[in-house]
Amino acid sequence: MATRTRSGGSGFFDRLKTGWTLTKDSAGVIRDHPKLLVFPLLAGIFSIIFLVIFFLPLVLANVVGGGLEYVVLFALYFVTTFFSTYFSAALVHAANVAFHGREPSVRESMYAINGRLGPIVVWSLISATVSIVFRVLENSDNPLASVMRAVFAVGWSIMTFFIVPVIVFEDVTATSMFERSGSTFKNTWGETLGAGFGITAIVIGIGIALVVVALAASVPVAAAFPGPGTVLAVVLVALALVFTFLLSQTVWGIAKTALYVYAEEGVTPKQFENFDFETLGGRAEHAATTGPDSDRAPRTAIER
C-alpha cells in the first residue's frame, strides 16, 4: 500500500517534499508513456524555427524604428505562443487520457486539440499583447514602470497558471478562461506554490547532475583527443540540457493536469495515489472521490 504524502506544510522542506512527490509521480507517467516527451519537443522545434524566421525582420525593424519593432515582436510572440499552447494543450489531453487508464496517442491528442483552436488563438493574441506591454514597461526609463511590470507579471502568472487545462477541459470565452484559471489557482494555491518551488528545484538539480555526467564522460576523450573531445563535450551537454528542458515541460504539464483534475473533478489520478490531494490549499474538506466515477475521464469541451 502506497504511503500518501501529506501536503499541507508551507516550509522549505515541505514544499521540496511536495515537489519531489509530484515530480516522481509525473516521472512515473512519463516512464509508462514516454511519447509524452514529444509534445514539448515539437513546441521547442517550432519556437526555434520561428525565432530563426523572425531574426532578420527583427533586426531590420530595430534599424527602421518608429515602433515597427513592436509590430514584428507581436507577430513573433503570437506564433510562438500559439504553437507552444497548442502542443501544451495536446500534452494535457494526453496526460488526462493516461490518468484514466488508456494509452495516449500523439496524433489523437493533437487531433482533439484541433477543436480548441479558437480559444488558443484568442489566448495567443491576448498573451502577445501582454508581452508587448511588458516589453514597453521594461524599456521604460521610469522606475515606476519597473515596479508596475513586476507586480503585473506576478498577477499575470497567477491568473494564467491553469489557462491551458481550462482551454482543454472547458468551453470558455476570452474573459471566462482567465476567471476559471484564476479560480482554479485560488482553490489550489498551496499545492501550486509548493509544486512550483519543488519541481523547479528538483529539475534544476537533475539538469546539473546530467551536465556534470556529460562533462565527466567527455574528459577522458578530450584529454587524448582535444578537438573531438571538445565537440563530444558540447554535444553531450547540449543533449543533457535538451532532455532537462523536455523533462521539465512534461512534468509541469502532467502535474498541472493532475492538480486541475482534482480541483475540478474531485478525482485523484491513480498515478498520484501516494500524494494527498485532500489538503490542496488547506481545503481538507475537499476529499478525492473513489469508486466507479474515479475511472471516468472528466467531461471536456472536446468531448461535448
Positions of PLM-derived features:
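Hydrophobic alpha-helical membrane segments
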Residues: 1-304
